[in-house]
A protein has these predicted regions:
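Charged DNA-binding/catalytic regions of mobile-element recombinases
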Residues: 1-135
Length: 135
Protein backbone atom coordinates (compact mmCIF):
# COMPACT_ATOMS: atom_id res chain seq x y z
CA UNK A 1 0.00 0.00 0.00
CA UNK A 2 1.20 3.52 -0.63
CA UNK A 3 1.43 5.94 2.25
CA UNK A 4 0.30 9.55 1.85
CA UNK A 5 4.00 10.49 1.49
CA UNK A 6 4.36 8.08 -1.47
CA UNK A 7 6.40 5.44 0.34
CA UNK A 8 5.21 1.84 0.57
CA UNK A 9 3.58 0.39 3.68
CA UNK A 10 3.16 -3.36 3.99
CA UNK A 11 0.27 -5.32 5.46
CA UNK A 12 0.16 -8.69 7.15
CA UNK A 13 -3.28 -10.13 7.86
CA UNK A 14 -4.51 -13.39 9.32
CA UNK A 15 -7.95 -14.68 8.40
CA UNK A 16 -10.05 -17.46 9.86
CA UNK A 17 -10.89 -19.87 7.06
CA UNK A 18 -14.13 -20.89 8.78
CA UNK A 19 -15.90 -17.55 8.33
CA UNK A 20 -13.29 -15.57 6.31
CA UNK A 21 -13.02 -12.96 9.06
CA UNK A 22 -9.79 -11.08 9.60
CA UNK A 23 -8.47 -12.12 13.00
CA UNK A 24 -5.53 -9.71 12.88
CA UNK A 25 -4.18 -7.12 10.48
CA UNK A 26 -1.12 -4.95 10.93
CA UNK A 27 0.90 -2.52 8.81
CA UNK A 28 4.62 -1.75 8.79
CA UNK A 29 7.20 0.07 6.72
CA UNK A 30 8.95 -3.28 6.26
CA UNK A 31 7.72 -6.72 5.23
CA UNK A 32 9.75 -8.70 7.71
CA UNK A 33 9.64 -11.28 10.48
CA UNK A 34 8.69 -8.70 13.11
CA UNK A 35 5.56 -7.79 11.15
CA UNK A 36 4.58 -11.47 10.85
CA UNK A 37 5.22 -12.23 14.53
CA UNK A 38 3.44 -9.10 15.79
CA UNK A 39 0.41 -9.87 13.63
CA UNK A 40 0.36 -13.44 14.92
CA UNK A 41 0.58 -12.18 18.51
CA UNK A 42 -2.53 -10.05 17.95
CA UNK A 43 -4.34 -13.07 16.51
CA UNK A 44 -3.35 -15.26 19.46
CA UNK A 45 -4.65 -12.66 21.94
CA UNK A 46 -8.01 -12.45 20.14
CA UNK A 47 -8.56 -16.14 19.49
CA UNK A 48 -7.74 -18.76 22.08
CA UNK A 49 -7.61 -22.06 20.22
CA UNK A 50 -5.75 -25.10 21.48
CA UNK A 51 -4.68 -26.01 17.93
CA UNK A 52 -3.81 -23.50 15.25
CA UNK A 53 -2.74 -24.17 11.68
CA UNK A 54 -1.24 -21.14 9.99
CA UNK A 55 -1.15 -21.31 6.20
CA UNK A 56 1.00 -18.79 4.34
CA UNK A 57 3.12 -18.35 1.28
CA UNK A 58 6.84 -19.06 1.45
CA UNK A 59 7.84 -15.47 2.09
CA UNK A 60 11.09 -14.98 3.96
CA UNK A 61 9.17 -13.55 6.93
CA UNK A 62 7.32 -16.88 7.37
CA UNK A 63 10.33 -19.13 6.77
CA UNK A 64 12.74 -17.26 9.03
CA UNK A 65 14.25 -19.01 12.02
CA UNK A 66 12.58 -16.52 14.41
CA UNK A 67 9.10 -17.03 12.97
CA UNK A 68 9.40 -20.82 12.79
CA UNK A 69 10.50 -20.91 16.44
CA UNK A 70 7.73 -18.48 17.43
CA UNK A 71 5.22 -20.88 15.88
CA UNK A 72 6.76 -23.88 17.65
CA UNK A 73 6.76 -22.05 21.00
CA UNK A 74 3.06 -21.21 20.56
CA UNK A 75 1.95 -24.66 19.29
CA UNK A 76 1.18 -23.31 15.83
CA UNK A 77 1.46 -25.77 12.95
CA UNK A 78 2.81 -24.09 9.83
CA UNK A 79 1.48 -24.92 6.39
CA UNK A 80 2.85 -23.26 3.26
CA UNK A 81 1.85 -22.91 -0.36
CA UNK A 82 4.05 -24.41 -3.03
CA UNK A 83 6.53 -21.95 -4.46
CA UNK A 84 4.98 -19.92 -7.27
CA UNK A 85 1.47 -21.27 -6.67
CA UNK A 86 -0.79 -18.51 -5.31
CA UNK A 87 -3.85 -20.74 -5.81
CA UNK A 88 -2.85 -22.68 -2.68
CA UNK A 89 -3.41 -19.47 -0.75
CA UNK A 90 -6.58 -18.40 -2.59
CA UNK A 91 -8.62 -17.28 0.46
CA UNK A 92 -5.87 -14.88 1.51
CA UNK A 93 -5.40 -13.61 -2.05
CA UNK A 94 -9.17 -12.99 -2.21
CA UNK A 95 -9.08 -11.17 1.13
CA UNK A 96 -6.35 -8.81 -0.11
CA UNK A 97 -8.20 -8.26 -3.39
CA UNK A 98 -11.37 -7.27 -1.51
CA UNK A 99 -9.42 -5.18 0.99
CA UNK A 100 -7.60 -3.22 -1.70
CA UNK A 101 -10.46 -2.75 -4.16
CA UNK A 102 -13.22 -1.92 -1.67
CA UNK A 103 -11.38 -0.09 1.10
CA UNK A 104 -7.81 0.90 0.44
CA UNK A 105 -8.16 2.11 -3.16
CA UNK A 106 -11.29 4.18 -2.40
CA UNK A 107 -10.09 5.75 0.86
CA UNK A 108 -7.97 8.86 1.04
CA UNK A 109 -5.59 8.52 3.98
CA UNK A 110 -4.33 11.83 5.34
CA UNK A 111 -1.56 10.19 7.36
CA UNK A 112 0.00 6.85 8.30
CA UNK A 113 -1.74 6.77 11.70
CA UNK A 114 -5.15 6.90 9.98
CA UNK A 115 -4.09 4.11 7.60
CA UNK A 116 -2.98 1.95 10.53
CA UNK A 117 -6.12 2.66 12.59
CA UNK A 118 -8.40 1.57 9.73
CA UNK A 119 -6.26 -1.53 9.19
CA UNK A 120 -6.56 -2.54 12.87
CA UNK A 121 -10.36 -2.37 12.51
CA UNK A 122 -10.40 -4.21 9.19
CA UNK A 123 -11.47 -7.49 10.78
CA UNK A 124 -14.83 -6.08 11.81
CA UNK A 125 -15.24 -4.13 8.59
CA UNK A 126 -14.44 -7.10 6.32
CA UNK A 127 -16.65 -9.49 8.30
CA UNK A 128 -19.60 -7.11 7.90
CA UNK A 129 -18.80 -6.55 4.23
CA UNK A 130 -18.58 -10.25 3.41
CA UNK A 131 -21.48 -11.49 5.54
CA UNK A 132 -23.94 -8.61 5.34
CA UNK A 133 -23.34 -6.77 2.08
CA UNK A 134 -22.29 -9.61 -0.24
CA UNK A 135 -24.53 -12.38 1.09
Amino acid sequence: MRQPNGKFRYNCSIIDLYDRSAVASLNSNYIDTDLAINTQKIALKKENYSKVILHSDQGVQFTSWNFVNFCKDNNITQSMSKAGCPYDNAPMERFYNTFKSNFYNVTSFSNVAMMDEITMKIGTIMFAFIHIIII
